[in-house]
Regions:
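Charge-rich amphipathic alpha-helical interaction elements
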Residues: 1-155
Length: 155
């Protein structure tokens, strides 16, 4: 798409008006880009922290691997994940709310005694995993918005 110049007073006034608008809005767009860059950096650090925590939790329970063979994984399921929307640096982003789990009743007399602790462990692991995935998705949204804003600055 080539820019066509017209050498008349009206088109010159239109170009000057567009230039003034771009010059006036450039500091705002640069500030938005900077805020988005900071948010991306912060979110990336949060994702790394959550992934490290998840790996640490999994490593801590490696000794119980043989016991998990008798555990019924259908005892606990994620029922719902609450989301809300929040505007951060001019971008609408989802915010993670509560995570609701459905725990199927089981007999504490017939089941092994560690199943209650196993359910809590699975809740913890699922919560950390969902939070990490959610933060990763949030980081992708922010990075996309940052790239678009950078394109506007570079115009």
């Amino acid at each position: 798409m080539a820019i066509r110049f017209q050498y008349n007073k009206t088109s010159l006034q239109q170009q000057e008006k567009a230039l003034k608008m771009r010059v006036r809005t450039l500091p705002t767009i640069k500030a938005k880009e900077s805020a988005l860059r900071q948010q991306v950096k912060h979110t990336k650090m949060e994702v790394e922290r959550l992934e490290a925590r998840l790996e640490e939790e999994l490593r801590g329970y490696q000794g119980m691997v043989r016991l998990w063979g008798e555990f019924d994984p259908s005892l606990i399921t994620v029922q719902s994940v609450e989301l809300s929307m929040k505007k951060i640096a001019g971008v609408m982003l989802p915010v993670l709310g509560d995570i609701h789990y459905e725990i199927r009743p089981f007999s504490i007399f017939n089941a092994p005694s560690w199943w209650a602790e196993g359910i809590e462990l699975l809740k913890t692991l699922a919560t950390v995993g969902i939070e990490a995935e959610f933060q990763r998705l949030k980081m992708e949204f922010l990075d996309h918005a940052r790239r678009k804003t950078t394109q506007k600055v570079n115009l």
